[in-house]
Swiss-Prot record:
Tissue spec: Expressed in placenta, brain stem, bone marrow, kidney, lung, heart, adrenal gland, liver, parathyroid gland, thyroid gland, small intestine and pancreas.
GO annotations of cellular component type: apical plasma membrane; endomembrane system; endosome membrane; focal adhesion; membrane raft; neuron projection; plasma membrane; presynapse
Residues annotated for Na(+) 2 binding in this entry: A96, D98, N101, S336, N368
Entry function: Serotonin transporter that cotransports serotonin with one Na(+) ion in exchange for one K(+) ion and possibly one proton in an overall electroneutral transport cycle. Transports serotonin across the plasma membrane from the extracellular compartment to the cytosol thus limiting serotonin intercellular signaling. Essential for serotonin homeostasis in the central nervous system.
Assigned keywords, A-Z: Antiport, Cell junction, Cell membrane, Cell projection, Disulfide bond, Endosome, Glycoprotein, Membrane, Metal-binding, Neurotransmitter transport, Phosphoprotein, Sodium, Synapse, Transmembrane, Transmembrane helix, Transport
Protein name: Sodium-dependent serotonin transporter
UniProt PTM comment: Phosphorylation at Thr-276 increases 5-HT uptake and is required for cGMP-mediated SERT regulation.
Cystine pairs: C200-C209
TM spans (from-to): 88-112, 116-135, 161-186, 253-271, 278-297, 325-347, 361-380, 422-443, 464-483, 495-516, 539-558, 575-595
Organism from which the protein derives: Bos taurus (Bovine)
Topology Cytoplasmic: residue spans: 1-87, 136-160, 272-277, 348-360, 444-463, 517-538, 596-630
Region (Disordered): 1-59
Length: 630
């Protein structure tokens, strides 16, 4: 094909969007007919002039160093995009708003000073969580790649970050969907006239079962258990049939069937990509808000609701002097927004190039934080009602944390409300949809990463690859479906994600803002949005956000969690196992760095320079003209 050099800005400007153009100021005169497979031009990403693969020798002229090259860039092979902008927003909101917003935030809030906790939570969100959230959306949208291959365009030596993210996603899928399976089991059990966790007359109940809400006079002892607690522990989990991590017992076939159904729904929701998942989230992302509103109104009308709200929001300003409160605030906002999991990179990569990801970051972050806050009212109005009925203090009712808060305390409260069957059904449906959204997102992050890394292998076999991922996650979940599976869920939740994801996110931020460069990153953002991030964002990205992550990591390492579930204290060897699981994902990063330095030719200095220099250009829409210093 004949090519003509473009020697001036005027000549470049003469060509409009839609005309074929190649980098290094070369325009293709011929326009391929529809159906023809044309070569895609690439760009230099601001570092070096990269010849266009497949072009003739006459197009491969080097440009002297320290000069400015006019570069006309084209889009690479057509990438799937969201059908509508709202599909993307709902997917991100559905991912960020998960089960943790319902059970973790309310518990952490009242435990750390009530209304006073909102101050450190807001500060950590503004200076730590939201900047990292914005960073990942911008990176994904600009480079249009998943969490593995994107590093060849940023800082190749850190490609191990993508591998670590994928391994963490597998760990999460191995236990998170089990919690959804518990909710599904509760949902199925709710289709009865009398909810099965309201009485002590079932086959799984023990002599210690005592019903608070019984009309008969009761005597509550230290060994007494509620019907809801025994339904959860002895019927759903059957944890009494396990001796601990050393003897998990057999599989619960009921939970195996539940999780098979869940993975089937997941598969048919994501097998075709964002075109299908973007439609599913219209239900799974909006339904929880309808139910939250219903439960909020119902809870507010219950006797004693005001006691729960007062307990939830009454500020204890002295708590702010404790370091643990700030650590909990930082950890909560980080895990709530979810940077570092590769999901935001994947979702944003399907956006249009000039989509306003800055606005998206602010909107979705605000929605996520507000959802957490409102969920606290939903939970504590009901806890206040329970305290009123039991004639106890709210603090006595709100002892449970984590899944127990939902499956024991809240389930018991619902069971003793008027129209309990209806509220139980909608509540557990809400939990299922909250969980499914996050699972869609987590697996899509892995799928996008692998498909982008190996396009020639999996590009036309997405359905089969997704099936393989889902089956792998199903088999990985089996250990959590045993009678002692709840012990494994707790172990994975504490160690497989916490410190590992924080460390990965810290290295990601350092790689982007210190190696790729804050100026280059801001230039990329300006190219997409038309404006450059201000000094506030730059300071947060370069210094505050990395320190924010380092603060949480150091706090975790200095005060490792003392794990206890029900009456079971985790043995020391299980804590060591937990650290090994967490390290297994993080170790991907130094392993790849070592491998990269070994296989790259040249001196050590040359190897390092090559490792931190982008090797794969980023293509942007045709017609966009960049001034690249090369």
């Amino acid at each position: 094909m004949e090519t003509t050099p473009l020697n001036s800005q005027k000549e470049l400007s003469a060509y409009k969007d839609g005309e074929d153009c190649q980098e290094n100021g070369v325009l293709q005169k011929g326009v391929p007919a529809p159906g023809d497979k044309a070569e895609s031009g690439q760009i230099s990403n601001g570092y070096s002039a990269v010849p266009n693969p497949g072009a003739g020798d006459d197009t491969q002229h080097s440009i002297p160093a320290a000069t400015t090259a006019l570069v006309a860039e084209v889009h690479p092979a057509e990438r799937e995009t969201w059908a509508k902008k709202v599909d993307f927003l709902l997917s991100v909101i559905g991912y960020a708003v998960d089960l943790g917003n319902v059970w973790r935030f309310p518990y952490i809030c009242y435990q750390n000073g009530g209304g006073a906790f909102l101050l450190p939570y807001t500060i950590m969100a503004i200076f730590g969580g939201i900047p990292l959230f914005y960073m990942e959306l911008a990176l994904g949208q600009y480079h249009r790649n998943g969490c593995i291959s994107i590093w060849t365009k940023i800082c190749p030596i850190f490609k191990g970050i993508g591998c670590a993210i994928c391994l963490i996603a597998f760990y999460i899928a191995s236990y998170y969907n089990t919690i959804i399976a518990w909710a599904l089991y509760y949902l199925i059990s709710s289709f009865t006239e009398q909810l099965p966790w309201t009485s002590c007359e079932n086959s799984w109940n023990t002599g210690n079962c005592t019903n608070y809400f019984s009309e008969d006079n009761i005597t509550w002892t230290l060994h007494s258990t509620s019907p809801a607690e025994e339904f959860y522990t002895r019927h759903v989990l059957q944890i009494h049939r396990s001796k601990g991590l050393q003897d998990l017992g057999g599989l619960s076939w009921q939970l195996v069937l539940c999780i098979m159904f869940i993975f089937t729904v997941i598969y048919f929701s994501i097998w075709k990509g964002v075109k299908t998942s973007g439609k599913v989230v219209w239900v799974t992302a909006t339904f929880p808000y309808i139910i939250l509103l219903i439960l909020l109104v119902r809870g507010a009308t219950l006797p004693g609701a005001w006691r729960g709200v007062l307990f939830y929001l009454k500020p204890n300003w002295q708590k702010l002097l404790e370091t643990g409160v700030w650590v909990d605030a930082a950890a909560q906002i980080f895990f709530s927004l979810g940077p570092g999991f590769g999901v935001l990179l994947a979702f944003a990569s399907y956006n249009k190039f000039h989509n306003n990801c800055y606005q998206d970051a602010l909107v979705t972050s605000a929605v996520n934080c507000m959802t957490s806050f409102v969920s606290g009212f939903v939970i504590f109005t009901v806890l206040g009602y329970m305290a009123e009925m039991r004639k106890e203090d709210v603090s006595e009712v709100a002892k449970d944390a984590g899944p127990s808060l939902l499956f024991i305390t809240y389930a018991e409260a619902i069971a003793n409300m008027p129209a309990s069957t209806f509220f139980a059904i909608v509540f557990f449906l809400m939990l299922i949809t909250l969980g499914l959204d996050s699972t869609f997102a987590g697996l899509e992050g892995v799928i996008t990463a692998v498909l982008d890394e190996f396009p020639h292998v999996w590009a036309k076999r997405r359905e089969w690859f997704v099936l393989g991922v889902v089956i792998t996650c199903f088999f990985g979940s089996l250990v959590t479906l045993t009678f002692g599976g709840a012990y494994v869920v707790k172990l994975l939740e504490e160690f497989a994600t916490g410190p590992a994801v924080l460390t990965v996110a810290l290295i990601e931020a350092v790689a982007v803002f210190w190696f790729y460069g804050i100026n280059q990153f801001c230039s990329d953002v300006k190219e997409m949005l038309g404006f450059s991030p201000g000094w506030f964002w730059k300071i947060c990205w370069v210094a505050i956000s990395p320190l924010f992550l380092l603060f949480i990591i150091c706090s975790f390492l200095m005060s490792p969690p003392q794990l206890r579930l029900f009456q079971y204290d985790y043995p020391r060897w299980s804590i060591i196992l937990g650290y090994c699981i967490g390290t297994s994902s993080f170790i991907c990063i130094p392993t790849y760095i070592t491998y990269r330095l070994i296989v790259t030719p040249g001196t050590l200095k040359e190897r390092i320079i090559k490792g931190i220099t982008p090797e794969t250009p980023t293509a942007i829409p045709c017609g966009d003209i960049r001034l690249n210093a090369v």
